[in-house]
Amino acid sequence: FFQLAVFVVILFNINLLSASAGSKGSSAPQSSGDSVVAEFCDTNCTMKKDGKWTECNGDCFCVHVGNETVGRCMRLDGDYDYTSSKTTRRNKKTRNGLCRLDRNRTTVDYPERNTREP
């Protein structure tokens, strides 16, 4: 009887863990005190031969992916100032990669994707 009880408890835990790990449905809405809206500007930015990036106009900053030499200018509007001189670098995880926010540019690094079908 003891072995059967342990087996049932193990099966219950496995079922509970697999159900919670596999749930990709919508969750309850979460509220954040910091609201940010990202908008692309009308201009692009490019990496110069010296490795520096061309400046974007106004409140816009340069965003590029990985080692690309061409990027887009982007603006963040909201309650939180990502381009503040007080914070020269912040890391923020995005859904598909790591987004590094600097004063002058933002880099999005995407991890290698698994191309095999599940």
Curated annotation (Swiss-Prot):
Keywords in alphabetical order: Disulfide bond, Glycoprotein, Secreted, Signal
GO molecular function: C-X-C chemokine binding
Signal peptide from the UniProt entry: 1-19
Intracellular or extracellular location(s): Secreted
Record GO cellular component, one term: extracellular region
Name of this chain's protein: Evasin P1080
Function in brief: Salivary chemokine-binding protein which binds to host chemokines CXCL1, CXCL2, CXCL3, CXCL4, CXCL5, CXCL6, CXCL10, CXCL11 and CXCL13.
Disulfide bond annotation, renumbered to this chain: 41-60, 45-62, 56-73
Residues bearing glycans: 44, 67, 104
Entry annotated with the keyword Disulfide bond: yes
